[in-house]
Amino acid sequence: MKKIFVLLFCLAINAVAQSPASAPQSARGLPPIIDRDLFFGNPEIAAAQLSPDGKYISFLKPWKDTRNIYVKGVDEPFSAARLLTIEAKRPIAAYFWTRDGKYILYVKDNDGDENFNIYAVAPDAKPAPGAEAPPSRDLTGLKGVRVEIFDLPKNNPDVIYMGLNDRDKSWHDLFKLTISTGEKTLVRKNTDRITGWVFDLAGNLRMATRSAETGDTEFLRVDPVKFSKIYSCNVFESCGPLQFKPGNQRIYVQTNKDANLVSLALLDPQTGKTETVESDLLGKVDFGGALFSEATDELVETWYIAARAKTYYKEKAFGDDVHWIERKFQYPKNEVMVVSRTRDERLWLVNIVSDTEPGQTFLFNRKTHTLTPQFKIREKLQREYLAEMKPITYKSSEDLEIPAYLVLPKGVSPKNLPTLMLPHGGPWGRDDWGYNTLAQFFANRGYAVLMPNFRGSTGYGKKFLDAGNQEWGGKMQNDITWGVKYLVSEGITDPKRVGILGGSYGGYATLAGVTFTPDLYSAAVDIVGPSNLMTLLDAIPPYWESIRKLLYARMGDPNTPEGKAWLLERSPLTHAERIRTPLLVAQGANDPRVNRREAEQIVIALRDRGFPVEYLLAPDEGHGFARPVNNLALFMASEKFLGEHLGGRYQEGGSPEAAKRLAEITVDPKTVVLAKKIDPNSVGLPKPAVDLVPGTYKYKATIAAGGQQIPLTISTTIQEENGAWSAVDKTEGPMGEGFDSAVIEKGTLVTRKREVKQGPVSIKLEFADTKATGTFSMNGQDKPISVDLGGPLFASAAGAVQSIGCLPLAEGYTTNFRNFDPQSQKEKLMALKVLDIESIIVPAGTFDSYKVELTSGDGSSDKQTIWIAKESHKPLKVDAVLASMGGATLTMELVQ
């Protein structure tokens, strides 16, 4: 039995009429084509959880085509469930109950930017009159900040211990959050490279984990006035805390310090001494994980994953109950997963899963030994048409044995088949046995599908993992190549009809495959894969600072001549001229890990040499596609693309929504322009042609995000005050009022002061030519700001578009200048260009205007188009793409 600590979002969807399939579709013996909506569409019901007291079952279900949280009584039918959230922009990806069951908490980011905030809603809350669901409370309320959850103490269920990186984007300070009030209290400022905080079973802060400058992981005992180092493992080893043992004297940890395989151990925080509890009895794989009792906190099971999962039960009653369920469902053909338990462990929710069963969920009463069916995940998906997943091994270069999983299309002889390689992401992860959406989707289309766990994959020990060090595009890629050779030698694969598809590292492996083995593949699909390892490492998000040394050790150090040369050599972009395989590239515009430049660099390189390439860019996605409509569009394009080049079957057409979305995210490669990064040394201060003019400018505005239109009223007032210009922007909308004010130097229009007030947040800043200083305040807590600047700021606060109107605009005019972003607390370089002169109609009238484009010099998707009146220099209209809001758009037009 395999347990998973992350939520499994197994999707279900209503059956829709199958569209006729396109030629070649007549392969005899293959089952009927399964509609792609049943693989990638929205769920009917998924991710069910029991409330701790056993009163409720919560689950995810679509509301207006977006996954939201519903709740029902444990004995009520699902038809009686109540809607608890109304997130229309992006599906809820994860949620959990508080320890006392008073609240359901969930996290949400902005269109894939991975800056998560925590929201709370009570399961018994009632909607306001006319509303469909009760309001959720944003407990953190910070933009551009990533929340990490460290502990939910059992003895204080109204508390969350969490980390916020608002002070320093690279490191999270520790806060105590009171759920009922939203009050946040700083517990520890993180100035010591702390990556995690560990609490005992009584809710006491006992330990911290630290990423040393060398990349080593250190365990620290938290003493009253200092940290004491008690344990460490080096950059090539793995160690991490799990949970304190009852009594709080020792803690369970997993570690492979001075060993090949990860084992389970007990560590004494006072002495740092460890005692091995267990490791794999067969000596082949790492310790996989542990489960602890909700009632007693005792260890109840451990598991290991080789070709299949193997579980060891530490509590007899727990193991007996699992075995009783297994006998009901023909284990090992099907596996039993305990996915949720009540606080007293009287009730379980269990999923019955296999390679051809996405999941059936049952409520198990341990006292009465009764199993009550709840729902079937992907109920309309025809299980009888799905294919077996077979664990295999094959030899690669250096005679290294590579574990893999092979899925062969059902109903046909496994001979001379079109084949698809599916390398996993990470690359420090692995594939394992079970239902796999992509493998089943493409097997249904007639492909043999191979998922190799190439060297560098985790779970098989330190030696196997380290064999992938600095082997991106090298021996790691060889392992994928030798997988193709193995299938060809077995007669399974037609060597002229081999494709490769992958996401993240799998996308890199796709690009590396068509670059370093250009004759091996006949079609390739790269999803959010990096093309240039140098720019990938240069653009990693700040909250990855703790693993920077690990990335350099595993991939190559870009700060050394040898490392830089190796990274460039292993970058597909460097060798793009070798590519002669048809390629489809898909990218999320807001990806914080693999910047859209990674996709567009390779698209431009192929386009410029006249080689055909297809490009999909989703403006509302990040690292991978989360919205079902985007996934449907992606795989509508992918299966047709692969079918045309490899001869597999594909479904013609699909839902109108997916077809419409595919048209929207399809980009003509001819139009792709790589944003140029600005050299900070080339940026000065633009010289205005005229000064500001006192007055008030009123605009009607709209923010468009996730299919919603949010109306706003914006006004800017400019007046002279104390020998300088005072500018105040006032924004009024459904969420209340916000103010942004500035002090602007006369003549030069340099921004000298800025003050922002929005809800509980206030920011006060002063700008010298080379320094930004000030305070960020929220709920009575102040955080200092002190950032070096490369020069004075222009158009960096209220009155910004009015200041731009004062520049000597003319056809072809360009300039660069500096802004300061209080959200990231970094200097931002901006590029301005006059695109055209055109007539424009706004509520205030018809005007001849300069059309001005303003872009960010860091290559992000930030972009503004501003129309400035030629005669009066008034800003008439602004269209802005807001990367900080996940690609939302702002439009404002002058009223008077």
Language-model features and meaning:
Residues I4-A12:
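Sec-dependent N-terminal signal peptides
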Residues P452-P680:
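Active-site-proximal cap/loop segments of hydrolase catalytic domains
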Residues A23-I45, F78-A81, D321-P332:
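A short helix->beta-strand "capping" segment at the edge of beta-propeller domains
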Residues L438-G459:
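Active-site machinery of serine-nucleophile hydrolases
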Residues K415-G425:
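Short beta-strand element of the alpha/beta-hydrolase
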Residues N42-I45, K64-I69, E87-A93, D100-P403, ...:
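Peripheral, non-catalytic segments that deliver or gate enzyme domains
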